[in-house]
Regions:
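Small-residue-rich hydrophobic transmembrane alpha-helices
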Residues: 46-106, 149-165, 275-333, 373-393
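Flexible, glycine-/charge-rich segments associated with ATP-binding catalytic modules
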Residues: 449-463, 569-589
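Glycine-rich/acidic phosphate-handling loop/turn and adjacent ATP-lid/helix
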Residues: 534-561
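Conserved short strand/loop->alpha-helix "switch" segment adjacent to the catalytic nucleotide/phosphoryl-transfer site
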Residues: 481-502, 556-557
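Short alpha-helical transmembrane segments in multi-pass integral membrane proteins
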Residues: 1-19, 74-142, 186, 191-243, ...
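Transmembrane helical elements of multi-pass membrane transporters/channels
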Residues: 14-33, 138, 149, 172, ...
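Helix-terminus/linker motif at the lipid-water interface of multi-pass membrane proteins
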Residues: 28-47, 116-126, 182-193, 254-281, ...
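Short runs within selected transmembrane alpha-helices of multi-pass transporters and secretion channels
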Residues: 26, 67-68, 138-158, 165-176, ...
Length: 589
């Protein structure tokens, strides 16, 4: 829907920045958590927390599926202006997740000892077993909050309150770190109590911030409403179907290091494995930009796909490509330059491990822009509900090509081949996908083929404009009247459609643009659907619900708000949606 590239860029970059901050806070919290544990509790209890990470992955598997599916279904419903449908998905997802979170919490506490053995603490090292037991006993208190945090963050962002998501992510990290410090200082001489406190601080932090996230949906302007009568098993099945690629991703993430590490050990031994460990330690910080852009792409593509806005999807891809080109290449160059310094933080300079780590990090730096592009492609596939291609892409990107590249290049070129395998595997995934997509879409526009858009996707008869002045609004309204008349719409509705645009868009330009000193844009899209004229007017000004304003005006004198009264008198249907920090009005005449 966003017709101007400036608005598309603004929305994408704003949300990318939000996701980058979230990922950075999460990565920093994990690193600081590890440093506090290792320096105060020793290597064995640090290993216990490392084994405990598997429990996070296990819980993430359950709630991650719903998080992806719920975001996709809700954004799709809001994209077409159906807030009731969005609330039905919201209610169904939240109620099921509450039940699953409760069951997971109870089962987690009942199965603490079996989980310890499953994750590798079989009791041969009593301190390791007891440390893992206490760590999970502490953090399992936060399973409900972890579920809520994982699932609600995307919805709160979609609801236009990304500042709250950023603030709660930072707060969660801060509470976690403060709790860790308190635990190691208060139970300095009791490692098991301290490790319990570290786990508990992580869990309770999720519980605390989830309360604030839930409070977002009590706002009057929130697009989501929880209603027990809206529960639908069909909606739950749809969410699970859309979110299943998350399951594939988890299994691929588990299988990939197992296979790759065997090759690394066979080719380079402990020296190569040490270099891989250093790379794993720093990778999270350098992936945040690509993951942030990809998260923003997924959010926008879900909305635009539901709106059947082919051009907006193409613009989103173009903006994402440029952003990756500028931001991720810059980060790649930074990592290349800092590789010796980073290697020196973990290993002694001059050793074989140090030399190999520098080579590995520099080759890894070359893969960052390619990885960001692959993440964006996957986000498009998930955002446009290409479920099977998304499954195949995940397996190829997360497991198949990395494992094959490492095995082949490692056998041919030794440890250097292992390092080069990072950018090579990323490039092979991109080239393979592009070749298959272009071959399958032969004869179509390149962008449509690469995005796997259906041949009949979008509206054959439509207009799209961006306006910034009242003169542009008047000129466009005349063009809309001509467009409607030339496509078989009767004269009365053609004139009414032009009047609706002139009143609504004119109101945005005359009043909305002047509410602050920021630069704004108003995007207009007109489509013909089932014999009706459908108009979407979207602006990035301050919140203004025209429907609420109309209800207020009805109680006042007949001369109050004539323009808004005129629009609602003309329209067959008019819906307002606050979406992605924008005002969207959908009018059907």
């Amino acid at each position: 829907m966003f017709r101007s590239k400036s608005m598309t860029s603004k929305i994408l970059l704003n949300y990318a920045f939000t996701f980058i901050v979230i990922n950075l806070a999460d990565s920093a919290s994990m690193v600081i958590d590890g440093l506090i544990t290792s320096r105060n509790l020793g290597a064995t209890l640090l290993a216990a927390t490392g084994l405990g990470d598997a429990s996070y992955e296990m819980v993430s598997l359950f709630c991650g599926i719903f998080a992806v599916g719920l975001q996709a279904t809700c954004s799709g419903a809001l994209g077409i202006g159906d807030s009731k449908k969005a609330s039905r998905y919201f209610t169904s997802g939240v109620l099921v997740l509450a039940a699953v979170a409760l069951v997971t919490t109870v089962m987690g506490f009942l199965c603490l000892d079996p989980l310890c053995r499953l994750f590798g603490a079989d009791g041969s090292d009593k301190l390791l077993h007891d440390g893992l037991y206490q760590y999970m006993r502490g953090w399992f208190v936060g399973i409900p909050g972890f579920f809520a945090f994982t699932v609600l963050c995307p919805l709160v962002t979609l609801d236009g309150n990304k500042r709250l998501v950023t603030a709660m992510t930072v707060l969660q990290s801060a509470l976690n770190i403060c709790g860790d410090y308190f635990s190691v200082l208060h139970w300095r001489n009791d490692g098991l109590r301290a490790i319990y406190g570290i786990g508990f601080s992580s869990g309770i932090a999720f519980d605390i911030v989830s309360v604030f996230l839930l409070a977002n949906f009590l706002r009057k302007r929130s697009a989501f409403r929880l209603s027990m009568g809206d529960f639908s098993l069909r909606a739950v099945r749809e969410m699970i179907h859309i979110g299943l690629p998350k399951l594939t991703q988890c299994f691929s993430n588990l299988a990939s290091p197992i296979v790759i590490n065997r090759t690394v050990l066979a080719v380079g031994g402990a020296c190569a494995m040490a270099a891989m460990s250093v790379k794993a330690s720093v990778a999270g910080f350098f992936f945040v930009a690509g993951n942030g852009i990809a998260g923003s792409v997924q959010l926008l593509s879900q909305v635009f796909y539901s709106e059947k806005d082919k051009k907006a999807l193409g613009e989103t891809a173009s903006v994402a490509l440029r952003t990756v080109g500028v931001l991720c290449i810059g980060i790649s160059a930074l990592l290349f330059a800092l590789s010796p310094l980073l290697a020196g933080l973990f290993l002694n300079a001059g050793t074989e491990e140090y030399r190999l780590t520098v080579t590995l990090l520099r080759c890894f730096s070359a893969s960052l822009p390619l990885n960001a592009l692959n993440s964006c492609v996957l986000s498009f596939l998930q955002g446009t509900r290409k479920i099977l291609p998304a499954h195949l892409y995940i397996v190829s990107h997360r497991f198949l090509f990395p494992a094959l590249s490492t095995a082949v290049l490692g056998r041919l070129f030794g440890t250097t081949g292992i390092a080069v395998a990072f950018p090579v595997s990323e490039l092979l995934v991109l080239l393979t996908y592009a070749a298959i997509a272009l071959s399958a879409g032969r004869g179509r526009e390149r962008t449509d083929a690469l995005l796997l858009l259906p041949e009949n996707f979008g509206y054959d008869e439509s207009l799209a404009f961006s306006v910034t002045t009242i003169d542009e609004v008047i000129g466009i309204s005349e063009g809309i009247e001509e467009f409607c008349s030339s496509h078989g719409i009767d004269k009365e509705r053609s004139v009414y459609s032009a009047l609706c645009i002139e009143e609504t868009a004119g109101n945005v330009v005359e009043h909305g643009f002047r509410m602050d000193n920021k630069k704004h844009c108003c995007d207009i899209r007109v489509m013909l659907e089932d014999g009706d004229v459908v108009m979407r007017i979207r602006d990035d000004c301050r919140y203004f619900n025209i429907k609420e304003r109309y209800e207020v005006l009805k109680s006042k004198g007949k001369t109050s708000g004539i323009g808004i009264r005129l629009v609602y008198g003309i329209a067959k249907e008019a819906n307002y949606i606050s979406l992605l920090n924008t005002n969207t009005l959908i009018i059907r005449v």
